[in-house]
Design a protein with these regions (language model features):
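Basic, glycine-rich polyanion-binding accessory segments appended to enzymes
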Residues: 1-128
Length: 128
């Protein structure tokens, strides 16, 4: 994201090479996505008015991104800057929170997109 402290790392892995902890995923800043669920190109962006999201664990249901961010207790001052991983059709991952149910790794998954966000440290206004 322009003028952001966020850095992102992306790798494509065969499903058989997933790390052992991928199902429980102890790191909220990494996500494992079904490559076949991606439509078009991956992009990073912030929220748009009216965004909707299919959070994993909601039984395939849809929720407004604003409502999701409120429920997740993302501070209001950060919501317009919060990184979203999207494709041409949908929000794939609200970084640090949930992936989309539409992008989850499933039994038919052959390749996985592994994504990790990290925030650069800022010290006295300078990146370190």
């Amino acid at each position: 994201l322009p003028e952001s402290e966020w850095q992102v790392e992306v790798r494509i892995l065969p499903k058989g090479e997933l790390p052992a902890e991928w199902r429980t995923n102890p790191d909220p800043w990494q996500a494992f996505l079904d490559r076949d669920s991606i439509v078009g190109q991956l992009r990073l962006r912030t929220r748009f008015t009216g965004d909707r999201f299919h959070p994993l664990g909601l039984g395939g249901g849809r929720k407004s991104l604003q409502e999701f961010m409120i429920d997740a207790k993302i501070p209001q001052c950060l919501r317009d800057k919060w990184p979203l991983l999207v494709d041409d059709e949908k929000i794939l991952w609200v970084a640090g929170w949930h992936i989309s149910d539409k992008a989850k790794v499933n039994p038919q998954t052959r390749e996985v997109i592994w994504v990790r966000f990290c925030r650069s440290a800022i010290l006295d206004g300078k990146r370190v």
